[in-house]
Amino acid sequence: MSEALETGDPSPPPPIVSENGKTYYYLNSQESQAPNTPSPQEVPPKKMTNLFESGPLVYEDVAADIEAVTERASRRHYENKMVVKNSREMFDNVNILPDGRYYCCLCNRPYKTHATLTAHLRGYHLRNESSCDEPGCNFLSFTDQEKKRHRRTHDKKKKERNSQESMVIHEKIQKAVRRLDYPGEDELRDHLNGSTEVQGTIRTMTKKGKIRYACLKCPHSVFNAYHAARHVEMHNDFPKNCFYCGEIRKGTVDLQVHYMRVHKHEGIRTFKCSVCHLRFTTTILFRDHVECENGCQNPEIRQDIYYGELPEGTIVDDLTQDRLQNFRKRQEIWKTMGQMVEEHRTDVHEEIVGESSVQAGDTTVFDGSRAFIQTPFGLKTALEVKNTSRFCPRSGKRTSDDDLMITNKKRERLEMAPNLHFHQDIIHRLPTSTTTQRQNNAFQNEYLRPPVSYGYDPLIGRYPDFQLMSQSSLPSSSASSSSYDPFATAVYQDSDRNPMQPNDQHICDMNNVGAYETANFGLDNSSDLVVNEATIASNLMVNEVEDEVFEELNKLDFVMPADDGNDNDDDLEEVFNFGNVA
C-alpha cells in the first residue's frame, strides 16, 4: 500500500495511522529546493488537502522521482512529493536487478542478498531513534542491540580508587607464597559430603582432590563411581539374560562375548536366502534357517545345502568366500585321508581272513571289529589296540617294521577271538528265545532296560572282566538273524577266575580246521569254530609273552631250575601271571 501527499509545511508531520491499523511514515522531513524552482516566498504554501489510498506501489510511476532524488547530494531530501510506505509492504515489494542483485526502492542502493537489503531498510529507512534513560546522557540508539550495548556501560560498578594498587600487591604475595599440591578446603568438603563407596574397589584421593576407584581383582582404576560399579559387575558370575535373544549367560564378560559373536554384526547381512530373501550374518545362522521344519519339503531350496553346500544365487562377501574355500580344501584332504585309511584296513582284514581259511558255509563269522579287549589300561577297542605306540618300555628301544608287522597280524588274530569263557557261560545259561518271544516280553513289561555300560565300574572299583557278546555265539534258529535283547542279564565273572584259562573243549589246529566243520561240538558248529579260534589265539599270545620274559631273564643271566619232579615252573608262572595277559 502506498499513498502520495503534497505538503509545503517544512516541519515533519507525525506518522499517519489508517483505519485498518497500518502505520505510515514520512521519509523526508525537509523540502528540497531545486535551482529552477521558485522560492518559498513566491510559492504559496499548500495545505494537506487530500490523502488517498491506492493499491500496491507501482515503481514505474515514481521512477522519475527516485532518479531525481538519487542525483541530489542528500539521500534524505526529496521533491515536493513524499513517498509514504508501509514496513511490511516495503519488505515484500523488493526489486531485483538483472544481474541478481537487490536494490533499495528508495535510495537505489544495490545489495547482494535479501538479508543485507532488509538490514539496510530497517537501519536507515525504518529506524526509530531512542534516547538513553540515564540522566545527563544524550546517547541516541537506532536499534535494540545498540540500546542494550549502551545500557551495559551504565550497569558496570565503579571500581575503588585503590583497586589497582591492591591488585598489584596481591600478585606479589601470590608469587612469593609456595603453592602446595594438596586439595583445598572446598575439595575436601565435597569429598566428605558426596563420596560414595563401591564394593570391590579401593577408594583413594589424588593430590588434586579427585577420588580414584581401584579394582581389587585387576589393575583397572576409574574416577567415576558409576563406571567403577559397572566394572565390578564384570567380575561377578551371576546369570544374566541377553537383551536381544533372552539367552542366559554366566556373568557380564560371558554376556559380552555372546553379544560380540552373535548380535554385533546382525545389521551386516552377507548370506541371502534365495526363497524368502532374508539375509544372515554367518553360515550357522543361514543353515539353521534352511534346516527348518519345512526346509526339507520346499522344492525351491537345494537339498545339498544340508551337506555343506550353498544354494545358487547366494550373495557371499570376499572374506566369507575365502573361508569357505579353505574349509572345502580341508574337507577334501580329510576325505582323501579317510579313504586311504579305509583301504588299508580293508587290505589287512582280507589278509587275516585269508590266513585263517575259515570256511563256515552260509553262517556269519564274527570278525571282532566291534569287540572290546581287556588291557592293563581298561577296555579298548580293536582300533585303539592296533594304534598303540611303537615304543617298547622294557628295552627302551623302538621296534622295527618287520616286528611291528608280525605283531599287528597277531593282534588282528586276537581281535577275532574274544573272551572264551564268557561266551560259553552265555551259551549254557541263556535259554533259547525267538524274536516273537522277545517282543511279547517287551509288551508285557512295557519298559526297556538300558544296555550294560562297559567301562570302569565304581561299585566294584575295577574294570569288569568280560567282553561284548558276538552275534554268532548266541544260540538261535538262524545264524543270519541279529537282534538285541534288552532283558538279557549281564553276567560278571568271579575275580579269582582266570579268563584265559583253557577249558576241556577239544583244541583244534589251524591246519585241521576243515576236519571240525562236520563235527558236532556244542549247540552250534559255527560257535564252536569261533571258540576254538579264540583258544588258539589266546594260547599264541601267552606263548609269545612267555618267550619275551625268558629272553629278558637270559639277558640278566638268570638260570632256570633243572627239569625234575620238584621244579617250580608253576610258581614262576604264578609270579609272572602269564595267563592274565590279554
From Swiss-Prot:
Subcellular location: Nucleus
GO MF annotations, alphabetized: DNA-binding transcription factor activity, RNA polymerase II-specific; sequence-specific DNA binding; zinc ion binding
Main location: nucleus
Superkingdom assignment: Eukaryota
One of the GO biological process terms: regulation of transcription by RNA polymerase II
GO cellular component entries: nucleus
Spans annotated as Disordered: 1-21
InterPro entries: Snail/Krueppel_Znf, Znf_C2H2_type
C2H2-type zinc-finger residues: 102-125, 130-154, 213-235
Keywords: DNA-binding, Metal-binding, Nucleus, Repeat, Zinc, Zinc-finger
PANTHER family, per the entry: AT-RICH BINDING PROTEIN-RELATED, ZINC FINGER PROTEIN
Name of the protein: Heterogeneous nuclear ribonucleoprotein C homolog
Organism classification: Eukaryota, Metazoa, Ecdysozoa, Nematoda, Chromadorea
